[in-house]
């Protein structure tokens, strides 16, 4: 499984990348707003830090404008992945852009039908939103499972990028089901390593080591 970090905070991205935990980055208009920076400037900086795909989203709803904005975004760096909404115009833009060799991340996916159409349009990634579905009373993980089955049935190459991930349990369940990628906020990725018994065991080992009076280096 690949880990993408869902943020436009360059400091957080750099920290996680230095740990070897970042395979890519996802951003959206809300994260750009939170960063307080120009989208082109911050996206270019992120692309210079991370070697993997960096998703940057268009802010358009109609095909023609999507294509204009996608052209600007695509020029930022070679590892750019253009992010489009799963709408009819978005699917049309996806088909056109992937035909030109661009990577495309189809976002705001809430149904298996949408995921099927995105794969047919040649999307590089499909981003089903787990947490937002959970908020409506629908189990977001069931959607991941449905998409996995459909993609496996027809050997679609589109990768399932589990998004709107809020908890470490979301990450575990997505991995068990077979999502190709999880994108999560920095805090969630860092929380994956935490377990009380790990820290308790470490405390015991260090206390016993101190009693030996030895040094390794």
UniProtKB/Swiss-Prot annotation:
Q: What is an example of a Pfam family matching this protein? A: TAL_FSA
> Membrane-spanning residues where?
none
- In short, the EC number is 2.2.1.2
This protein's pathway: Carbohydrate degradation; pentose phosphate pathway; D-glyceraldehyde 3-phosphate and beta-D-fructose 6-phosphate from D-ribose 5-phosphate and D-xylulose 5-phosphate (non-oxidative stage): step 2/3
Q: Which GO terms describe its biological process?
A: carbohydrate metabolic process; pentose-phosphate shunt
Instruction: List the PROSITE patterns hit by this protein, alphabetically.
Output: TRANSALDOLASE_1, TRANSALDOLASE_2
The source's superkingdom equals: Bacteria
- Major location category of this protein: cytoplasm
- What reaction does this catalyse? D-sedoheptulose 7-phosphate + D-glyceraldehyde 3-phosphate = D-erythrose 4-phosphate + beta-D-fructose 6-phosphate
Keywords for this entry?
Answer: Cytoplasm, Pentose shunt, Schiff base, Transferase
The molecular function terms in GO held by this entry are: aldehyde-lyase activity; transaldolase activity
| Enzyme class of the recorded protein, top EC level | transferase
The positions flagged as active site in the entry are 83 (schiff-base intermediate with substrate)
One CC-aspect GO term: cytoplasm
Location(s), subcellular:
Cytoplasm
* Family per record: Belongs to the transaldolase family. Type 3B subfamily.
Described by its record, this protein's role is as follows: Transaldolase is important for the balance of metabolites in the pentose-phosphate pathway.
Name the record gives this protein: Probable transaldolase
């Amino acid at each position: 499984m690949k880990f993408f970090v869902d943020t436009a905070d360059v400091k957080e991205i750099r920290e996680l990348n230095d740990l070897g935990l970042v395979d890519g980055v996802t951003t959206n208009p809300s994260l750009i707003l939170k960063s307080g920076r120009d989208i082109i400037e911050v996206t270019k900086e992120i692309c210079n830090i991370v070697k993997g795909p960096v998703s940057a989203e268009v802010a358009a709803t109609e095909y023609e404008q999507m294509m204009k904005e996608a052209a600007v975004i695509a020029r930022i760096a070679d590892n750019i992945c253009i992010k489009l909404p799963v709408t009819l115009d978005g699917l049309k833009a996806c088909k056109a852009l992937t035909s030109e060799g661009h990577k495309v991340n189809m976002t705001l996916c809430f149904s298996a039908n949408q995921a099927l159409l995105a794969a047919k349009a040649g999307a590089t990634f499909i981003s089903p939103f787990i947490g937002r579905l959970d908020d409506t009373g629908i189990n977001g993980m069931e959607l991941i499972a449905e998409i996995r089955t459909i993609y496996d049935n027809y050997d679609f190459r589109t990768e399932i990028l589990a998004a709107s991930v809020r908890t470490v349990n979301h990450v575990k369940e997505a991995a068990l089901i077979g999502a190709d990628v999880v994108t999560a906020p920095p805090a969630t990725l860092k929380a994956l390593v935490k377990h009380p018994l790990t820290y308790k065991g470490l405390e015991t080992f260090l206390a016993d080591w101190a009693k030996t009076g030895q040094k390794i280096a």
